[in-house]
Structure formats: C-alpha cells, structure tokens
Amino acid sequence: MPMETTTETKQSGDLIFRSKLPDIYIPKHLPLHSYCFENISEFSSRPCLINGANDQIYTYAEVELTCRKVAVGLNKLGIQQKDTIMILLPNSPEFVFAFMGASYLGAISTMANPLFTPAEVVKQAKASSAKIIITQSCFVGKVKDYASENDVKVICIDSAPEGCLHFSELTQSDEHEIPEVKIQPDDVVALPYSSGTTGLPKGVMLTHKGLVTSVAQQVDGENANLYMHSEDVLMCVLPLFHIYSLNSILLCGLRVGAAILIMQKFDIAPFLELIQKYKVSIGPFVPPIVLAIAKSPIVDSYDLSSVRTVMSGAAPLGKELEDAVRTKFPNAKLGQGYGMTEAGPVLAMCLAFAKEPFDIKSGACGTVVRNAEMKIVDPDTGCSLPRNQPGEICIRGDQIMKGYLNDPEATTRTIDKEGWLHTGDIGFIDEDDELFIVDRLKELIKYKGFQVAPAEIEALLLNHPNISDAAVVPMKDEQAGEVPVAFVVRSNGSAITEDEVKDFISKQVIFYKRVKRVFFVETVPKSPSGKILRKDLRARLAAGVPN
C-alpha cells in the first residue's frame, strides 16, 4: 500500500478533506498547449491520434505541428487573443487541431453538440460571440443563416459548401507565423456550456491555469492518481464536446504521450473491434456504455485482455452494473470518477487507478483529487458535516471555473466568498475518505451523461397556447439513467394529448431533451415564492401515482 497523507483538517470550524496522495508541483504558469506538449521530445515519433474511422495515425510531432499551423490559419482569418471559435464537430482529429490551435493564440473554444437543433446551436454561438464556426458540411444548414447575417466564417472539415472555407486552408499556413501573445494563467481557453445547479445553459469559463491544474491532479506526480503512460492506448468514444472527454481523455492523454483512439460514436461491434485491434488499455466510459458492454451477447467473442483501466463518469454507476462489467474485462481495474463542468471538471477520482493503487469500495466515486479541498455541508445551515453524514459536496482549488460568462449572479450563487464551489450534489465521505453520491439538490436531469435543464423544456412548454403551466423532472430509466418527463396543466377547455405535447417539444430540441412521458395534472405544486416543488413530483413518480 502507498504512503498516505493527512486527509482531514479543521479550518475556522470547517472539516476539510484532502487527497490521500501528497500535493504535487503544478506548472500553473504554463499555457495549456505548452503544458500538454511539454514532454513531447520523449515521444515525438509515437502515435498521438488514431482515427478509428479510417485507421489514419498522426504522430505527436505531426499533431503539434498541425496545431501550430491551424493557429496561424485562424489568425489569418482574424482570430486574435480572447476571441472565440465554435467547434461544432463529432470526434475527429480536426477537433483536436482546432482546440489546441486556438489555445496557441490565446483564443477560446466553445464546444457544441453537432446534433443540437439550429436554435440551440445559434443560441450558444450568439451567447459566446463566436467569430468562426468549425463544422462538417452536413451541419452547415444549422448555422448558415446566422453566419451570413453576423459575418461569422464557417469552416468545414469535409467538402465545403458554397460560402464556406475548407479546413485545409488552416493547415496550409506557415507554423512559424504564430503571433507572439502573452497568455495569462487566468485567461479563458475553453467555454463549455452547462446548466449548473439550476436554470438555462451558461458558458463555463475554464482557464489555462484551471485545466492545467485539473490534468495535473489526475496524471502528474510520482504516484499519479490516474496512472497513464506513453505506451497506453486511450479509447476516445465519449464526445470531445463534453468536458469529461476533452479533459480526462484528450488533455490527459496528450500530457503523458499516450495514443488516443478516436471513435465518432458508440456502436458496440466496431467499438469492440477497435479495442481488440489497437489493444486499448484505458477505457473512460459512461454508465450507458458500461450497460451495453455488460448486456451485449457479442462481447465474449472479442479479446479485451489489453484493457487495464475502466473508468466511469458523468453519472453514478450502480454497484450491480459495476460488478456485471468486471467479468468482461479480465485484467482491468474498474472504478468511478466524479465531475462537474464548473469544477474543471474532476472533483474525485478512484485511487485504484493510481500508479501505486489503493483498495477501494464498489459504488464509491473516488476520493478528492490532490491539490484541492473538499467539504460536505448541511444544505440548510451551511455548516460542515463529519464523515458518513450526507450533505452538499463543495470543492475548492485552482482547477475550478473562473465563473459563468456574463453572469456574475449565477457565479456568486455557485462559488462563495471563500472560493468554495457548491456542486448541488448530495454525498458523504466515509471513514476511508471515499466519496459516495446519494442524491442531487440541483434540478439537472442526466440522460446518458448529457445534461437536460428542466427550465429550458418548461419555457418551451409554456409557449404552447394549450398549456397553462408545466414542470419537468427526471424519471429513473435503466438504459439512460434518467429521462425527462413533464407534468402539464391544460389551458381552459384544452384537450391537448400526450403525443401532441411530445411532438411539440421534439421538433425544438436535441434527442436527449425530448420529453418521454407527459402527465396531466390540475396544478403544479409550488412553494409560496413560486418555486416548483420538484421533490413532490419526484415522490409521486417514485410512488407510482404521477397523476
């Protein structure tokens, strides 16, 4: 067993938990790209990106060179320090080149799901003030009008329709022409959108210092919490527009010199084939993928013995599912991490993944990352709680977000005066420093790891002339974890049906935000201040009497 450090301290009455691993030196002064490529001379000729779609392999030297060329290309199109580009792409090498290229300029990348509806994409492009959108030709229709009306350039990674540029125009630049920029540690580099603990999606400002710290907390140090090395092959099937994949797969992989195997979307047979073919050693997944592996009859036909780490995040993984999937990966350590976009995103990581591993319990989602502090507080009083008592999980450290873009009020609600980020998740820390999540204070629905903000769907429902009031809450689902369901009050005399409500929503939102059930009610329960009492509605669902 590795050496442990003191994990519990008292500060001004607060009980504060720290990692069992000692703090490490983190080069927080480095821009993100410099940090990720800091040790490139040790593995410049090794594979960096493997494109699962066509087996094309890019070495570290080729990737770093292409990122610098793209930086110059973006600059020639007018992108300067602190400008924003939107990456509207599925997993692809170009996603990596665009994100890292923007970092070299001190520019910001906002990442959006290419399956968003046109309205959802445009909303994010507007809110983030994106000056360039990098996408595929099949998604151009979603942004075409907005781009032409707002002088936003659209770049396609495949055949470019009229009025769009081709990505090759970026990669043909002279890499030596990168403008000299002085990037400050607190400058924003990534702008993912998250609903936070309540409300509508907001831009989460993640800085160079924040992402460098978060990656270092996972993979740096003598005894790295998430042990990876240059011989590893990481499966990148989770979407890079999601911070879990961007941080714990791409950035961590680049830092250690591992090969990153890019897969556009999850499909069980090709997924298993790629693991076998490229001898994937690290599998960062989400519960729906774990469920598919546990239940698929074809898994036993493939050799998965190369996998040594199976990590699940983005939503809690049940103990039964954890046990079921263990049998499919004979040589793998299986465990969970816990993250939240605003926290950079990793708060806790399973110590079975450490270079010198610790024993862990099934169902735990790790222990707090090093160089950070965690406390559990009573949601009503704000007082910190001792071990084994559930309360709101709070985290403090250099890895957390700078704040929400143009939303100081939401920032103040999430990060308090002492620098603690309040997650809105309820959990407890046991006598072995392991964190268990038990409930969610926040309103967010997690569909297969994707965020659904009830307020967003409720606003759309209230636009319907035959609906006078509505509330959206999560309903448990074996496949998806949670699905959104709506409680709807019909307008006077209206006979609107469940199917009509579902169709009305499905035309306006991406698939995972679609309402799966509609329950018609006389009234939506509310507090005296008018806040929807979601707990009451969730209790009705649990009791099997929604109406």
Curated annotation (Swiss-Prot):
* Alphabetical list of InterPro entries matching this protein: AMP-bd_C, AMP-bd_C_sf, AMP-binding_CS, AMP-dep_synth/lig_dom, ANL_N_sf
- Tell me one GO biological process term: phenylpropanoid metabolic process
Q: Which GO terms describe its molecular function?
A: 4-coumarate-CoA ligase activity; ATP binding; CoA-ligase activity
Question: Is the Ligase keyword given for this protein?
Answer: yes
Q: Reaction catalysed?
A: (E)-4-coumarate + ATP + CoA = (E)-4-coumaroyl-CoA + AMP + diphosphate; (E)-4-coumarate + ATP + H(+) = (E)-4-coumaroyl-AMP + diphosphate; (E)-4-coumaroyl-AMP + CoA = (E)-4-coumaroyl-CoA + AMP + H(+)
Where are the annotated segments for SBD1? Answer: 267-336
Q: What is its EC number?
A: 6.2.1.12
Pathway assignment reads: Phytoalexin biosynthesis; 3,4',5-trihydroxystilbene biosynthesis; 3,4',5-trihydroxystilbene from trans-4-coumarate: step 1/2
Q: Where is this region: SBD2?
A: 337-404
Briefly state the protein's biological role. Carboxylate--CoA ligase that may use 4-coumarate as substrate. Follows a two-step reaction mechanism, wherein the carboxylate substrate first undergoes adenylation by ATP, followed by a thioesterification in the presence of CoA to yield the final CoA thioester.
Name of the protein: 4-coumarate--CoA ligase 1
Q: What is the gene called?
A: 4CL1
